C-alpha cells in the first residue's frame, strides 16, 4: 500500500511559525516520525509540500493510480479551495484531513473545511500526533474497504 502525505501552504515553516498554535516540531520532524509509523504498518509514503494551490492539484493528479490514499493538511486552502476539493473528487483518491490546531476553535473564517465532506474523516487539534492518527486511520479504512470488496 502506498499513502501520499500532502502538505499545503506555510507548513514548510512549522517549528518557527506560531509555535503556540502549531507546536515546535518541524515538517521534517513530523515526516520522519510518519516514515517510522508507515514502516511499522508495512506501507510506503510519498510526501509533498507546496505553497501553491495549483501545484497541490498537480501533485494529486500525478498521484492518481499511484497512491491508495492521502493524508492531507491543506493549511489555509482547507477553508477556501473548492479546486483542491474537486481534485480529490476527480481523482477519486480517498483521503483523511489533518490539522495541527483545532480549526473549530479558531477564528470564524477557519472553522469551515471545503474538503471535509469529501473526506473519509478529519483529525484536528492533536498537534503533530494527528498525522500519525490520520495515517493509521486511513490505512485501517482502506484495509476494511479491501476486505469488504473481497468478500462482497
UniProtKB/Swiss-Prot annotation:
GO terms for biological process: amino acid biosynthetic process; aromatic amino acid family biosynthetic process; chorismate biosynthetic process; quinate catabolic process. Substrate binds at residues 73, 79, 86, 100-101, 110. Transmembrane segments: none annotated. It catalyses: 3-dehydroquinate = 3-dehydroshikimate + H2O. PROSITE patterns: DEHYDROQUINASE_II (PS01029). It is an enzyme of class 4 (lyase). Gene3D superfamilies: Dehydroquinase, class II. Keywords: Amino-acid biosynthesis, Aromatic amino acid biosynthesis, Lyase. Pathway: Metabolic intermediate biosynthesis; chorismate biosynthesis; chorismate from D-erythrose 4-phosphate and phosphoenolpyruvate: step 3/7. The record marks 17 as: Transition state stabilizer. One of its GO terms (molecular function) is 3-dehydroquinate dehydratase activity. Its EC number is 4.2.1.10. The active site is at 22 (proton acceptor), 99 (proton donor). It comes from the Bacteria. It holds the Pfam family DHquinase_II. Homododecamer. Catalyzes a trans-dehydration via an enolate intermediate. PANTHER family: CATABOLIC 3-DEHYDROQUINASE. NCBIfam families: aroQ, PRK05395.1-2, PRK05395.1-3, PRK05395.1-4. Belongs to the type-II 3-dehydroquinase family. HAMAP family: AroQ (MF_00169). This is 3-dehydroquinate dehydratase. It comes from Gemmatimonas aurantiaca (strain DSM 14586 / JCM 11422 / NBRC 100505 / T-27). The lineage of its organism: Bacteria, Pseudomonadati, Gemmatimonadota, Gemmatimonadia, Gemmatimonadales. The gene is aroQ.
Amino acid at each position: 500500500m502506498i499513502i501520499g502525505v500532502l502538505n499545503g501552504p506555510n507548513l514548510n515553516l512549522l517549528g518557527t511559525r506560531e509555535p503556540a498554535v502549531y507546536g515546535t516540531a518541524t515538517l521534517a520532524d513530523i515526516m520522519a516520525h510518519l516514515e517510522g509509523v508507515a514502516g511499522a504498518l508495512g506501507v510506503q509514503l510519498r510526501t509533498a509540500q507546496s505553497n501553491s494551490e495549483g501545484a497541490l492539484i498537480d501533485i494529486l493528479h500525478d498521484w492518481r493510480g499511484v497512491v491508495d490514499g492521502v493524508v492531507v493538511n491543506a493549511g489555509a486552502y482547507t477553508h477556501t479551495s473548492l479546486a483542491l476539493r474537486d481534485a480529490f473528487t476527480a481523482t477519486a483518491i480517498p483521503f483523511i484531513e489533518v490539522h495541527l490546531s483545532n480549526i473549530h476553535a479558531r477564528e470564524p473564517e477557519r472553522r469551515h473545511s471545503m474538503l471535509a465532506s469529501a473526506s473519509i474523516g478529519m483529525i484536528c487539534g492533536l498537534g503533530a500526533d494527528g498525522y500519525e492518527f490520520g495515517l493509521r486511520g486511513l490505512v485501517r479504512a482502506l484495509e476494511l474497504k479491501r476486505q469488504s470488496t473481497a468478500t462482497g
